[in-house]
From Swiss-Prot:
Component of the Mediator complex, a coactivator involved in the regulated transcription of nearly all RNA polymerase II-dependent genes. Mediator functions as a bridge to convey information from gene-specific regulatory proteins to the basal RNA polymerase II transcription machinery. Mediator is recruited to promoters by direct interactions with regulatory proteins and serves as a scaffold for the assembly of a functional preinitiation complex with RNA polymerase II and the general transcription factors. It comes from the Eukaryota. The lineage of its organism: Eukaryota, Amoebozoa, Evosea, Eumycetozoa, Dictyostelia. Residues 76-104, 651-662, 669-678 have a biased composition (Low complexity). It is found in: Nucleus. One of its GO terms (biological process) is positive regulation of DNA-templated transcription. GO terms for cellular component: mediator complex. Component of the Mediator complex. Residues 55-104, 267-288, 608-687, 1085-1121 are annotated as: Disordered. Residues 614-636 have a biased composition (Polar residues). Belongs to the Mediator complex subunit 16 family. This is Putative mediator of RNA polymerase II transcription subunit 16.
Amino acid sequence: MIESVWSIKIMEGVSEDFYDSGPTFQYPNPLSSIYDKSMNIDLMNHYHPSTSLITNSNNPFYESLSDTSSDDLNNEDNSNSNNNQNNNNNNNNNNNNNNQNSNNKLLGIEKQLQSINLLTNKVDWSDYHQQVYHGCSNENSQLISWSVDNQIAFTMNFNKNQFIKQEQQQIYITRVEYPHEYVVIKTSHTNSIKCLEWSTQSPSNLLLSFDQSDKLCLWKTKDNCSDDWYCLHIFPFQYLLLSKWLPLRSTYTPIFDPFNLNNTNNNNNNTTNINNNNNNNSNNSNTSTNTFKSPFESLITDNHIDNSFQTFISITKDGKIYIGYYGIVESCWKYIIGQIPLPFYHTIDCVDIFPTQEPDSLLVTIYSKNIGLALIVYHINYNIHTSEVTVTLKDKISMSNIIEQQQQQQQQQQQQQQQQQQQQQQQQQQQQQQQQQQQQQQQQDVDIRSLSFRISSIQFDNSMSSLIVLMKGIDSSAIYRLEKKLISIDSPQLSIFELLSGTAPNETNQEIEEWTCTAKRLFYTPNNNNSNNNSNSNNNNNSGNNFNHYSTISSIYFSSTTGFLWLTHSNGSIEIVDRLTFESISTLKESEKPIDNIIISSNLNNENSEQSIMNSPTISGSTSPILQSTKANSPHSIKDDSMVIDPSNPTSTSTTTSSTTSQIQEQDNNNNNNNNNNFLPSTKNTTLSITSSPNGGLIACLNSDLKVTLYSLPIKSIGTSPDNQKVVSKWLAQLFQNSMLKSNDWWDILILLKIYSTSPDTRTTFHHTIIHLSSDFSCLPLTFQQTYRHCFDAIKASIYRIVSGMEVAFVDSQAKSFIYYLCDTLKSSFSPLLMQPSQQSDGTTNQQTLKERENIIILIDWAIEFSQFFLKNCYYFSFVYAKKGDISVKIPESMLDLPIKHYFPFYYSETKGNFHFPIISFLCDFNLLFVIFELMNISKLFKEKTSTSQSKVKFKKSKEIDFFLEYFTKIIKVLCKEVVSSSSSSNNNNPDEINNTLGLIDTYLSTFYGFLSEDKLDQVITPPAIECKGSHMNSIIAIMKKFDSIIPSEVIADTNDISINISYSILDLDPPLDGFLDQNPITSSSLSTIQQQQQQQQLGNSSNNNNYNNNNNNDTSGNGSVIFKYSPKSTEYMGIVHDIITRIPIAPRIDKPYKKCIRCHRITVMLRTSMFWSDRWSMACPICGGKWKSYQSSSSSYSSSSNTHDIANNFNSNFYNNNYSSNNFNSNYYNSNNNNNYNNNNYNNNKYYFNNSNNNKINKHLNKTNKHLNNIHRHHNHILINRT
């Protein structure tokens, strides 16, 4: 089943000039100005003899091909009446004759409509030109686009009257992590926007938009973290048909299809598949995963061309090729021009481009109705330095031959079926005759419609030798897959081939390359009379044979990453099919779509919501398109406090919600009926455009009522058996690989993981996904591992973060990312700050260099805090389990030879209580232990060579580092000796080899600092590679129990001052709570609810516990739709927060602008003069790689930017979140420092959001929270005292 993730709807407000436009105009509701342009409307039902025009919704630029058009009839009538003006009798006679002649001609046209093979039409605009949606057809437009960093841009082209006034079009931008707010761009487009396209060249994402006239615009934010958009450049390109960005790296082949492994044949009920060529299907279907390469494999084996320039390709209807690029020397945007050779008065109707593996080269496939039913493939080479564009004809594909072959095969198949029916049903001759007549009638209709096809869309299938073509008829459509293959030539055909080509093929290899149709599927509507007569019987007997009038295809979309083809039907349903066979995988019908999967919580009453809406900022004086209306008594206002709609049970909402929804729908339907009764066959919500997520796991659909809905792949339909779980975990791991290589955000993959893990049998899929991803990552060369290690660690942390009960694994992953970040920062800063200090002319040291050193010292404080935290946890572990044997980790036998660093080892812990010792898993990763050793040695050197007296530096000297290194070195030696000895004994190695390995480790640990202090960085010994596998786990635990004999007890002497919870806050290891997936976690079945509560209290995550319990209550069976809940969080923060880059403490309620990571929600202050070592983190977060989002200050956090608006009024619930996060501090600090914050926060809440009654509830809730936190702290101190 295709699951729905979230939906947002933007209602357009009424501007002031709307009321001045006259009484003839109606309310510009989004539902009132859309009409279908997919050639699926019955011509006879929309034929008006009075105007002699066919009011179909086809392209108005296609003129009729009949002998006598309406213009000729009118001219003939006018000429006859003008020639006989002097004679009244003759006038009457001539007029009567003319009327009779015109009526006869009209009757003749009506008869020709039933037999003519090809008919194109034009539209009569006289009846509804005031309400028409001035847009473009679905297949030629892209009104929504999804960027690689999770931004969705969409637009709707509404004009009140296109003949009187052209309006300024708007583009809306929202982030999927924050669906409650969006950005509005007032564009310079006055005509309908035809396409939106995000650049795939990270990190500077650009938005491309072009309209139907003569304008292509590039949009960019003012900086990398703000929401202020501006037009970067405008290109005067006329009659644009297509514009695409070239990828920064050439496209990878799609990963394997997990749905085709089950060999399910779920055909659509409203379609018929006439492709019965089983041989072709069996040859082309991917029945095994071995035929596809994983992204990591293609990275190693394939040659990929990296584009060094930001480049986009634009093609116009008249064949012009514009190649736009950014000139680095000129620092401006430029373009070069090429031309596709076309005959005079010929235009291009459909086109698609595909970049090849060669540099500066691409393929273009075009279709023109003037040329005929054929596709022409061109090869284009360009050189931006010489401004040369070379166009070469490559292939010509005739679609007429394919259709004729299709009809012949269909006739032969039906003849065989009729013969079989006659043999089997000889006793029922009357029924056979009726069936034969119906089949012949349907066959005749199919033949007529097949001949009236025209190509509507072309898609490259990630290959230069495969195409997907959409063809449309009067009331039918078809999709074809074309592949260029080697075809053997029979001996009678050799002479013909030699005659036509001039050369004969090789005798040994009598094969030629030719485009062939490997898969096809036909969608058509039977005759209305037959369908009406047999509707009852078809519905009762077999719904699969019932073809309604809206079963044809409106548009197609191909997801290149996952390799799935999405079909949008004209009846509103969405279908996903296999790209190789066109077999249906899943279908989401219009009646099955949820009304609203998620409604953003609005914790306001009607009056306050109206006030906050009126005070919300707008851009360029435009009306803010918000969910609630700006009018006081508008039926669009939402009055309930909090709403979450279950798609499987729409009646589960409150009465206010249902009544409000009914009022909205009633008003929309009234406006729609008033405005669309002239040209719409029915008032239905149509899908205008779709786009896929960066990794192809989700799609975003834009509907005609300006509603964006996210749908996922039907991953739950794969199954829950162990074999199916292996397939899903491997498939998700390869999607994560694709996101790493293409620098895409992996939010959509986490959504798929969440949806699949709703069943109790599949809640361990996350663990197997991490194992697959880690195993494949370890097979990469070391150079690639160093390049993608940062992203790999962030992905593992993101997976652990959304799983209930895996908070310790998340903390370990975050700490690992911190360690790598600090080690890389100190290494890169070592040479410029210590080895080459800059001096002024008077010989003194530059003050800027000293300041840089002091800022580096602040980073070292984190390393010292972590070292103390690490030793303390090691001592606690040995203290608790020294005399106990209940700690045991039973790893499966199949994973005993797998390195433990690929997964969280204590996932297999079988203790009765919960395992709540973070950082202990580091002892199983020797590579990470050596990195910690290097980090502390470099920190010691910085401390010794930099003298500072800053008050904000906690550790003035390096004695804490010496203390840590003394005992940390002993721990490494003991663990290495045990692992090396056990590995060597199992492999029957000589004792000399064991001693040599241990000698190298001892030399490395004893001489590393000496080489470092002597500035011999190139001579530092590299530690040997030691792998700790699953078979070593029990022996490592036995050594960990004896750490109390290695580590002195004085490491816990200051327990009362520095507790574990305070260390979480200082080290920034708390799991964030305000993300979309944080509110929709995966419930782990390995831990009980009581254990989860204990663990979350230990980590300071009590607020997440409520979400987990709610998720358990709503998601225990794993059946039905997945419910996603979301409540917007405030952007303010309280308490002590450290800058994620500089580690400088940030005071609460600062007035400086700051940035917040959209993925891990950590904060950094925007410095006017950034330090040289922090410049590289201006684009993304150093911990998780997420993008920054800027905020002006905490006092103005209601609106994060002048361009950002809340779709639902944002509930300032930060006081609620920070109550739970503040339990990281002791109760005295908490009570003494947060009273003022609460008072100030309540004051702001009274000012912006809440009334007096809500404040009373808030105060009561705060008192309860304080008591609860005090009890937790007293209980925790009691445990620490007993342990001491």
